[in-house]
């Protein structure tokens, strides 16, 4: 399957769970035939319970609902939580679940990291927001800053087709000779255009990265990238510096208060290279950044699940929406500019690691280790990921007057 640019879409930017969850729950309530939902994380908290209620009501009124969760990201849902949904007819699957070893989750590579919802053939959501209370602004200092899009229009059919073709037993045959795809060209740029792109470990291994590279090559005035886990390969780093050196304003927003310390260490390894090359780097300080968005000039934008790190670019299953629309671009720009002004600290010369031989050696070693990490993982014993469907709970046998206990063949009193 290969998607093209679709015209005539209605695309809405959603910021954080405050906007995303009400929109998803409303769409589920309006569903008439089909709901497909896949996510990396679903927690059994306030948000998860609201999603549970929405799906249960939809299934009870006859809507076919399918849920796919990642076996690493969502390992701890209770039997009661899942069983109530499967009893109502919801098809509930885990992507590549694995048993724990000494209480630890071991299935950390090649995860299903997409966040997609499709309602009938009318509405779709694509983004980076999971289903947990930590995506709500009232969660506290650790509330995540993130984005998604709600879309109606022709591109929804592409997203639905992708979901249907990737259901169990429907995966297309592997075609190793078609692994490398050029970024789809928008030959007739206009408004309200959208392109659905994804990353897998078969034919579409670097599709999302190619669109970033193409965007940086074509940029004329401005690029803003906000990415939670930023540690891309040399090609993308070089493209950012090259754009900045030809006069493009290139701004990068990364985590200043990361949820994982190694994220900050990894990003700071690149500060010298980027800042010396003219890239403006900003650390988001208000709370953890979880977004994966970018824009270029006054028309191009992307929102999705893909980070710019080795896991997302080389191992995980990801999905983004590429958008060509001036109104959407301006909406996203206003949001990111507000973040830069109000919640970021620009990285200046005083914040750069000192250029010592020891720091240079550490940076080179760490950089090459992280960049070659996917290849190292490839040496581990490989297996084919599988989807595990959760069956409905067994119904208890009904007691009747005519039932005879097999342990007691005598007559009941």
UniProtKB/Swiss-Prot annotation:
PLD phosphodiesterase domain mapped to chain residues: 108-135, 285-312
Compartment(s) of residence: Cell membrane
Highest taxon above the source species: Bacteria
Keywords: Cell membrane, Lipid biosynthesis, Lipid metabolism, Membrane, Phospholipid biosynthesis, Phospholipid metabolism, Repeat, Transferase
Pfam entry (one): PLDc_2
HAMAP family in alphabetical order: Cardiolipin_synth_ClsB
Name of the protein in question: Cardiolipin synthase B
Organism: Salmonella typhimurium (strain LT2 / SGSC1412 / ATCC 700720)
């Amino acid at each position: 399957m290969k998607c093209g640019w679709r015209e005539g879409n209605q695309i809405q930017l959603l910021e954080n769970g405050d906007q995303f969850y009400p929109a998803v729950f409303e769409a589920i309530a309006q569903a008439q035939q089909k709901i497909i939902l896949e996510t990396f994380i679903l927690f059994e908290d306030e948000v998860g319970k609201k999603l549970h209620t929405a799906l249960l009501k939809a299934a009870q009124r006859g809507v076919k609902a399918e849920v796919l969760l990642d076996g690493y990201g969502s390992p701890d849902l209770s039997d009661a939580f899942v069983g109530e949904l499967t009893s109502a007819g919801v098809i509930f699957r885990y992507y590549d679940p694995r048993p724990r070893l000494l209480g630890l989750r071991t299935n950390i590579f090649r995860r299903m990291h997409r966040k997609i919802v499709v309602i009938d053939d009318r509405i779709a959501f694509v983004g980076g927001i999971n289903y947990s209370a930590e995506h709500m602004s009232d969660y506290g200092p650790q509330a995540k800053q993130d984005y998604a899009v709600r879309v109606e229009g022709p591109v929804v059919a592409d997203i639905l087709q992708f979901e249907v073709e990737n259901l169990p037993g429907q995966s297309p045959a592997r075609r190793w000779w078609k692994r490398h795809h050029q970024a789809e060209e928008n030959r007739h740029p206009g408004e309200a255009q959208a392109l659905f792109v994804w990353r897998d470990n078969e034919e579409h291994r670097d599709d999302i990265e190619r669109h970033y590279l193409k965007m940086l090559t074509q940029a004329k005035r401005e690029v803003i990238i906000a990415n939670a886990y930023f540690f891309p390969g040399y090609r993308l780093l070089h493209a950012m510096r090259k754009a900045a050196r030809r006069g493009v304003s290139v701004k990068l927003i990364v985590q200043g208060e990361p949820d994982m310390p190694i994220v900050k260490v990894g990003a700071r390894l690149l500060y010298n290279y980027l800042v010396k090359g003219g890239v403006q780097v900003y650390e988001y300080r208000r709370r953890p950044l979880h977004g994966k968005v970018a824009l270029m000039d006054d028309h191009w934008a992307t929102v999705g699940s893909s980070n710019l790190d080795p896991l997302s670019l080389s191992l995980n299953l990801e999905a983004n929406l590429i958008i060509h629309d001036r109104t959407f671009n301006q909406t996203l720009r206003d949001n990111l500019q507000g973040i830069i002004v109000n919640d970021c600290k620009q990285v200046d010369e005083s914040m750069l690691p000192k250029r010592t031989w020891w720091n240079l050696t550490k940076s080179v070693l760490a950089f090459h280790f992280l960049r070659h990490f996917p290849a190292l993982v490839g040496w581990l014993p490989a297996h084919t990921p599988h989807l595990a469907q959760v069956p409905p709970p067994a119904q208890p046998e009904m007691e009747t007057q005519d039932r005879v206990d097999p342990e007691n063949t005598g007559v009941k009193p």
